[in-house]
Amino acid sequence: MKNTKYNLASDSWGEEEIFAINDVIKSNQFTMGPKVKKFEEEFADYFKSDYAIMVNSGSSANLLMIASLFYSNDYDLKKGDEVIVPAVSWSTTYYPVNQYGLKLVFVDIDRNTLNIDPKEVIKAINQKTKLIFAVNLLGNPSDLEDLKSICKKNEIILIEDNCESLGAKYHDRYTGTCGLMGSFSFFFSHHMQTM
């Protein structure tokens, strides 16, 4: 039997990408340079958002979303408050919540979508619930209309982990733009990657 090896990841770079990489290397500005600023502006425009802030990973983006809510004077988020999350996701959704001393409340998913089930969310809400962290899994949008309605009725914040669903739409809006904030990722295991 022949041993066949498959690369976990491989590049598909052409001349244009190689020149772009060389331009960045020659500039000696590997972060926060003009190319990043341009990418942020074009990304925000494409998704019809006011802002886009690029960081090193979707994991860091999730952490920054939680941190910005935790340290903001506009939101009353403190240690011990509860965050409703889907039972199916990645550690990178859960760890930032835990890192800030917030309590994870896992709710079951809808078997048809693999996303958080709004009916289960309603059952989990109590006085300590401050946030719903929806995850749009594998290009499949959560029921964002129901989640937004639940959040509005209960004065709860909705944020989205959209790392697996870049470019997906829910009705006429891109996923990741339906809550207060959304995270995106270009990690190599996702359907669109960057370097």
Residue ranges and their predicted role:
Residues 88-94:
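Conserved coil-to-alpha-helix start sites within the AMP-binding
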Residues 112-194:
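Active-site phosphate-binding strand-loop segment of PLP-dependent enzymes
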